[in-house]
Regions:
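An anion-engaging/catalytic patch
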Residues: 1-129
Length: 129
């Protein structure tokens, strides 16, 4: 798997490329931190735990869409963490009705500096060469 780290407003958003499924998986905790503008890992983790339980209770598909993958943490060790694909990230952002969520989605979906934007640029460059 290929690892990619992008920055939204100087905040890290980690992603892994899955060759088997040909798609990116994004760290849920990184996205929750961005959407809540929170730096405290414990608060981010607790909020995701709360939101995940609430969504599970509502039978929301988003919880079933999460996949646990190993990502490198700030301590340098790899831990299993919840990840979502692009569609899941968009759905997750809908549960954060604030301006940050809209700005994040604009960056995530439409920006040339987004992960997909970078991938498309690279693909076009390879295709044209």
């Amino acid at each position: 798997m290929k690892i990619s780290i992008r920055f939204f407003n100087d905040r890290e958003v980690r992603a892994l490329w899955d060759d088997d499924q040909s798609k990116w998986w994004f760290s849920v905790l990184d996205i929750v931190g961005v959407l809540n503008d929170e730096n405290d890992y414990a608060k981010i983790r607790n909020y995701w735990k709360y939101l995940k339980a609430k969504l599970k209770k509502e039978n929301n598909q988003l919880v079933r869409a999460t996949t646990q993958l190993k990502l490198t943490a700030s301590d340098g060790k790899k831990y299993n963490t919840d990840t979502l694909d692009s569609n899941g990230v968009v759905e997750l952002a809908k549960h954060f009705p604030n301006n940050r969520a809209m700005k994040f989605l604009d960056w995530f979906l439409y920006s040339d500096t987004s992960i997909d934007g970078q991938s498309k640029k690279k693909a076009y460059t390879l295709f044209e060469s």
